[in-house]
Amino acid sequence: MSLRILVTGASGFVGGAFLRRFQGQPGLDIHGIGRRACALPNYHRIDLSQPFTLDWQPDVVIHAAALASPWGTRAQFELHNVQATANVIDFCTRNGNPRLLYVSSSSVFYREEHQYALSEDSPIGPRFVNTYAQTKYLGETLLDGYAGLKSILRPRAVFGPGDTVLFPRVIAAARKGALPRFVGQSQPVIGDLIYIDALCDYLYRAAVAPQLQPSYNLTNAQPVDLQQLLLDVLARLQLPLPQRQVRISTALRMASVVEGAYRLLRLRGEPPITRFGVGVFAYSKTFDPRRTLADLGTPSVGLDEGIDAFVRWQAAQWV
């Protein structure tokens, strides 16, 4: 009998990658839902902001749908990250309480400071770096009342083919010659990342694991110097390296001013610079991987292999 898995957010980066990676695998019956049109098999276009039904009952639900952005209105984030999660839980409750895996975000832990070896038990809140992080945590709290087996999975800095958030923004700035080289840090800024295929495999392992702990932080377990990694990727893509030096403290102040102007004037779109975006290169964020390694194993794709694959994919987009 096949294991029936439903993945939400299947028209997005993580959910779509999971659907493509595992659909058609022996012993699996996978369906995806999302708010955008999508040509993938077994895909259902469903608006999660409203209660929904399916003529199909899953054994596992991977809730990867979210508004993943450093910028947006509170109403948008609450609709897509909180109300949608409540509707997914409602669906699960009406369909036999399947195992529920909530794909949250490592940003729920973040503060505007260096943070090393963050564990699943590190403190969360009461203040958050942005509304995205706050509403992802509010989504986490909704699982408290769910009667089925559940776990919260918090990936850190997901990248790979199909990425629309992490590398594409800095690559676009580099192509325009608008990317600065940040200076003024007292120490190298290091951080964890996770390659998309490694994340998808962790999601699958969590779907079939005999037992699960309440939460897992998902990384490639290989912290790197983030600015040096970016420079290496730009060089391999034959893009101009940033020459203009900007102190990180200056960039943070500039981002605050720009964000304030966007809020005051109610400007459309995302600001060209945000404190969250600058913070990636301002503050180290590393994670203690021991719980994940013990329960879910080592990453299926190493960080270097993932970066190689991303560079090949990105270069092919310009051919």
What residue spans do the PLM features occupy?
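Conserved Rossmann-fold NAD(P)-dependent oxidoreductase catalytic core, especially the SDR/UDP-sugar
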Residues: 87-131
